[in-house]
UniProtKB/Swiss-Prot annotation:
This is Alpha-pyrone synthesis polyketide synthase-like Pks18. Changing A209F: Retained reasonable polyketide synthase activity with lauroyl-CoA but cannot use palmitoyl-CoA. Pathway: Lipid metabolism; fatty acid biosynthesis. It comes from Mycobacterium tuberculosis (strain ATCC 25618 / H37Rv). GO terms for biological process: chalcone biosynthetic process; fatty acid biosynthetic process; polyketide biosynthetic process. The gene is pks18.
Length: 393
């Protein structure tokens, strides 16, 4: 006798049983997304953190604030950052005090972003056997500049990409934008396995620097740096053998955390793009990361102990510390994130790709494949990330 799954009642022979898509087992993937090329870059200007602290302190008249500022910079655990412009330079100081309008700053962003983004994109594609026509999608991610036609159009023209290329611009997704962009590119190449996608993240926080009599401005300036990263994404048949150094994107994930809207707030003021980080953000991260990651791993037949690599967004000491604490993993597993934070500061969407690059470059002969989880945080608060494998040998 046939029985209805919903009610347990007998079902007559020949009666059609409706099955929703959600009840069907997932079809095995025929293709997987692979990071085939990766390059990073920064502006040439190196800013020493202790020097920056001393110079910022001089801007404040209140003795208490002047004494507090060096401690803020020291707690950042950042040694150096790279910047397109020095926001404490005399010329930029005049530009800032006029004050510079949002229009002025966006033109400054474009001026410095284009050559850096073009250079990094060329290096990501260097040595790969692609014709320009094979790059079918360009995804540009940034939260520090918006102008159109913008950096994406400049990349298309400078690299000689097809004028019919699809373009997606991811704006104002904050530090999580690289994962959002990567997810878009992954979906594209799996749907169009003969084509490639180029993901470019460019962040120039320095062009938006503002110093008012506000400790939030000081905290923001103590953390953020400038940088660029580019990824070339292709598709591979699941049974294909991949070369060492390739990164397989097994799955992407995104979760909007409840009641955390104040955690990360990006905005636009008359004189630039603004960022506010709530004192509640570390608590949101501690309570939110483990449930999101654990569920994603469960969906992929894994658990936290199965993960070899943890690419945690190096957004600041509390971001890394609370992520580690939430997951219950060894502090040593966040070493690459701490290293990127110390050398470059928080480069928003770019930072996580720097961490991933470090992991790819570190040889590990003990295992043929290293499995990792990468994640970052955006306004919402949103946790965006991916499960990946690095092919070692």
């Amino acid at each position: 006798m046939n029985v209805s799954a919903e009610s347990g009642a007998p079902r007559r022979a020949g009666q059609r049983h409706e099955v929703g898509l959600a009840q069907l087992p997932p079809a095995p993937p025929t293709t997987v997304a692979v990071i085939e090329g990766l390059a990073t870059g920064t502006p040439r200007r190196v800013v020493n953190q202790s020097d920056a602290a001393d110079r910022v302190a001089e801007l404040f008249l209140d003795p208490g604030q002047r004494e507090r500022i060096p401690r803020v910079y020291q707690k950042s655990r950042i040694t150096t950052r790279r910047m397109a412009v020095d926001p404490l330079d005399a010329k930029f100081d005049v530009f800032r005090r006029e004050p510079a309008t949002i229009r002025d700053r966006m033109h400054l962003f474009y001026e410095h972003a284009v050559p850096l983004a073009v250079d990094v994109s060329k290096r990501a594609l260097a040595g790969l056997p692609y014709r320009a026509a094979e790059i079918g999608l360009l995804v540009l991610a940034t939260s520090t500049g918006f102008i159109a036609p913008g950096v994406d159009v400049a990349i298309v023209k400078e690299l000689g990409l097809s004028p019919s290329i699809s373009r997606v611009v991811v704006n104002f997704m904050g530090c999580a934008a690289a994962m959002n962009a990567l997810g878009t590119a992954t979906n594209y190449v799996r749907a169009h396995p003969a084509m490639k996608a180029l993901v470019v993240c460019i962040e120039l926080c320095s062009v938006n620097a503002v110093f008012a009599d506000d400790i939030n401005d000081v905290v923001i300036h103590s953390l953020f740096g400038d940088g660029c990263a580019a990824l070339v994404i292709g598709a591979s048949q699941v049974q294909e053998k991949l070369e060492p150094g390739k990164v397989v994107v097994r799955s992407s994930f995104s979760q909007l955390l409840d009641n955390t809207e104040d955690g990360i707030v990006l905005g636009v003021n008359h004189n630039g793009i603004t960022c506010e980080l709530s004192e509640n953000l570390p608590g949101y991260i501690f309570s939110g990361v483990a449930p999101v990651v654990t569920e994603m791993l469960w969906d992929n037949g894994l658990q936290i102990s199965d993960i070899d690599l943890w690419a945690i967004h190096p957004g600041g000491p509390k971001i890394i510390e609370q992520s580690v604490r939430s997951l219950g993993i060894s502090a040593e597993l966040a070493a690459q994130s701490w290293d990127v934070l110390a050398r470059f500061g928080n480069m928003l969407s770019v930072s996580l790709i720097f961490v991933l690059e470090t992991m790819v470059q570190q040889a590990e002969s003990a295992k043929a494949i290293s499995t990792g989880v990468a994640f970052a945080f955006g306004p919402g608060v949103t946790v965006e990330g991916m499960l990946f494998d690095i092919i070692r040998r």
